[in-house]
């Protein structure tokens, strides 16, 4: 079931909250950023729990950073040096994180007002990114569809370009399976089905190499409690995880997250080859939904994607979308208790 609820006004335009429910779970979506605002699932006692960080007003989404729940594009993650070359032509895109381009630039897709259509169990958002937006070549039409059925949220991405360009889409939901207002996620247990990761330089930009997780704190192939990893000063400067994993591939389980306190778990599968694991180490203090105060280490992002900086790394799978081709990607989150 899909219903619209008044949420706010932006630039004179009414912004509704779009709610999908399958009778067991419910997701709240916003046309601003094609974003997930809330996701309510039952805990082991049957109590409905909102497990995504979000805001109570449109203005917070417009003015604050961190991309809470937003659709990220035109190119998710980092492009080293904020430039790339396609067929001999070099393009300079917006540098909004030092010398690099992060999450599509200053006004990425998470800062755009999308059109939408509703169906019984799905919402499709559409946005047309003009040629030259944030420096990226070619006009690109993007569709993002959210489907909710049988306790599973599916996100489907489609894109078509009028000119060869870079497209790398993801969702930046911050999951806290203890409840969005429950504090740090140290009690969560995480598994990531990946034998390798992409090492980075000092700017967190992949160098083009792959490395084994064996013998490192990045090895999450068996269920691992996050508590010891979030504030270890010897690990990523005490900021926790902000690393891209090379998923083992296939339409099998890519990652699983579980909160023993509530019993809520999610199992994630995806068509993508990479996943940025981010445990919100750089999330600055801010007021979220219902007056909750969010801060570092209070969410887990499972950002399925092409590898960061792939357009500048020939050994990585290419994020280039050719004119006349259609990009199709998907990610599913299945919610259950144990």
Language-model-detected regions and their locations in the chain:
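An exposed, glycine/acidic-rich loop-and-rim segment of catalytic or binding clefts
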Residues: 1-338
